Amino acid sequence: MWLAAAAPSLARRLLFLGPPPPPLLLLVFSRSSRRRLHSLGLAAMPEKRPFERLPADVSPINCSLCLKPDLLDFTFEGKLEAAAQVRQATNQIVMNCADIDIITASYAPEGDEEIHATGFNYQNEDEKVTLSFPSTLQTGTGTLKIDFVGELNDKMKGFYRSKYTTPSGEVRYAAVTQFEATDARRAFPCWDERAIKATFDISLVVPKDRVALSNMNVIDRKPYPDDENLVEVKFARTPVTSTYLVAFVVGEYDFVETRSKDGVCVCVYTPVGKAEQGKFALEVAAKTLPFYKDYFNVPYPLPKIDLIAIADFAAGAMENWDLVTYRETALLIDPKNSCSSSRQWVALVVGHELAHQWFGNLVTMEWWTHLRLNEGFASWIEYLCVDHCFPEYDIWTQFVSADYTRAQELDALDNSHPIEVSVGHPSEVDEIFDAISYSKGASVIRMLHDYIGDKDFKKGMNMYLTKFQQKNAAAGNL
């Protein structure tokens, strides 16, 4: 994920005012404009708070999720039906939940009667809910059902509303998601930890004149029985995935599409009337996927990849499985009014997020402590990819200015921190998305690559991705 600065840099302020800044400013400031950094690009380490991870006595196998957003009232209704494994007998289920009201909950052991929850104990500070049951849930598999409601918030996290203006000048809203680091719990009750993976069957009930997107391709679209103005859109089952990589979008979009040379359908969604501005990102993505496939010697595991420009988006971009979300300025290129530095920036952003489809999505770090591997690796290989696809950019010269030198300057400060930071409470996670994790992490990976040599480095990447695909890994595994 690329994150924007908390204290706006000069480049970020210019981005808000209009067209991208001139090349020199992009060269110096583009890194900090993508990341949630403090005034010097170095996050202050948070005070440690007591924290316990979710108990392991109940875990999900598959989550069937149906959401019905209301784009006028800014609310949503949801139904979760999770196939779960009870590993240790218990009379409660602890999940992550924030800013959501649970209406009903029940658990049905396989082949047995449904047991209705008798209480919901919200631990708001820890963003958890405990579902209490009147009898013990025995070991084995069963189905957890939860009905809930929530708000399409205006905080650009969780399931939120994004304001846009139609070509005719009308203000409307899209419903979009941003779940990294710990905000899937704001869209549905879930096991919102990187190490807990499940498959997802997602359905969206949306206005029939809106585009509905999610991680996988659409497998069914039919009229909604209770309202002739709505349709229910069902998506194919995802691979096993962590909750922070789940995504869905409902809005009005144009698109351009192509196929990469290895047969993956690539689609770029743009605001209505701006499809032409998505063609450069489409070209980059179509070149990037085969490069990573060849470099890792691991094929892209899904049939399609969607890239979409979001009007209101806090992050620079987010690598959701198969539905990568971007700020408009990080994805769209006006072919008549853009400079070379703008194209280079978009190429780097696309290269970064698509690298995560392998390094982060296919193989996921076990906990946020290992963020520097996830983001440091993507921040390095984005340059390798762009240099291969667009050698005329001479992009490695920008790495020295934008990452290597910046990492050295920040690491020399008294308030610097180790490249790997122990993380516990959710409030601590965002604090490590800084230039040490990204730029120093990328610089260390670059040194390792140069020391080992490209041939052996590629061999090691293949072994790592093959061994841990669809699983979690820690720094020691690499």
From Swiss-Prot:
It comes from Homo sapiens (Human). GO terms for cellular component: cytoplasm; extracellular exosome; extracellular space; membrane. Its EC number is 3.4.11.-. Keywords: Aminopeptidase, Hydrolase, Metal-binding, Metalloprotease, Protease, Zinc. It is an enzyme of class 3 (hydrolase). Aminopeptidase with broad substrate specificity to several peptides. Belongs to the peptidase M1 family. One of its GO terms (biological process) is peptide catabolic process. The record marks 438 as: Transition state stabilizer. PANTHER family: PROTEASE M1 ZINC METALLOPROTEASE, PUROMYCIN-SENSITIVE AMINOPEPTIDASE-RELATED. Binds 1 zinc ion per subunit. It comes from the Eukaryota. The active site is at residue 353. GO terms for molecular function: metalloaminopeptidase activity; peptide binding; zinc ion binding. This is Puromycin-sensitive aminopeptidase-like protein. Disulfide bonds: none annotated. Its cofactor is Zn(2+). Zn(2+) binds at residues 352, 356, 375. Substrate binds at residues 180, 316-320.
